[in-house]
């Protein structure tokens, strides 16, 4: 994740000879400088220039801070703190999970090494989450990759809310809820393997259509060549 963020926000100039761009097919209502790909960022949503948005729809008073990566989610009136990555997945059972972690965290982080995670460390996680080591890792080795932290939700909006609440809990700014402790939770590993790639592709295609229509209407409104609407 950190390598991707660096490439699209700072290192893209090194690849200009390949015609690579930091903004690839999207709508940015504020005309900002953030990096994005196949994303719709409505006017009013603010994204730091050192953030990257992918396959996402941002609207309302959404604010994305620096060094964030946001992928596969819908955000309305949400604040994503600096250095946080959100990655939304639709599962094969029709449910949703939003994985959240620090942009510079290592999924291979190990409990015994007290590896950093978001605003805390892995040894502090059980107390902050109100869960035992066994409840978080079960029979798996205690790597971050296997930690069951992400609630399974009925909608992407609920999953986003749950993910951002997890950020607040691990930062010590909010107490963990009983709903969280009692929820079905998945790890990075489990959610990756349970993802419905067909539905994720459908979401990307529907978002692309929305972007294309918006660019088409904007081109007409600004009296530009309509062909520009199809350009990335």
Walk through the language-model features, giving the residues of each.
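Left-handed beta-helix
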Residues: 1-232
């Amino acid at each position: 994740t950190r390598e991707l963020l660096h490439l699209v926000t700072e290192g893209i100039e090194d690849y200009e000879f390949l015609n690579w761009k930091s903004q690839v097919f999207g709508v940015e209502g504020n005309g900002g400088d953030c990096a994005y790909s196949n994303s719709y960022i409505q006017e009013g949503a603010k994204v730091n220039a050192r953030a990257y948005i992918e396959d996402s729809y941002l609207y309302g008073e959404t604010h994305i801070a620096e060094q964030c990566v946001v992928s596969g989610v819908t955000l309305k009136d949400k604040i994503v703190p600096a250095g946080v990555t959100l990655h939304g997945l639709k599962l094969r059972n029709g449910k949703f999970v939003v994985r959240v972690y620090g942009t510079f965290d290592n999924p291979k982080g190990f409990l015994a090494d007290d590896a950093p995670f978001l605003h805390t460390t892995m040894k502090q996680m059980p107390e902050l989450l109100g869960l035992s080591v066994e409840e978080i890792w079960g029979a798996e080795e205690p790597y971050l990759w296997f930690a069951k932290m992400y609630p399974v939700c009925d909608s992407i909006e609920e999953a986003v809310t749950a993910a951002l609440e997890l950020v607040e809990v691990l930062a010590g700014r909010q107490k963990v809820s009983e709903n969280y402790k009692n929820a079905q939770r998945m790890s990075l590993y489990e959610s990756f393997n349970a993802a419905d790639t067909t539905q994720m592709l459908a979401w990307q295609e529907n978002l692309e259509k929305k972007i294309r229509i918006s660019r088409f209407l904007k081109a007409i409104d600004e009296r530009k060549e309509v062909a520009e609407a199809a350009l990335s």
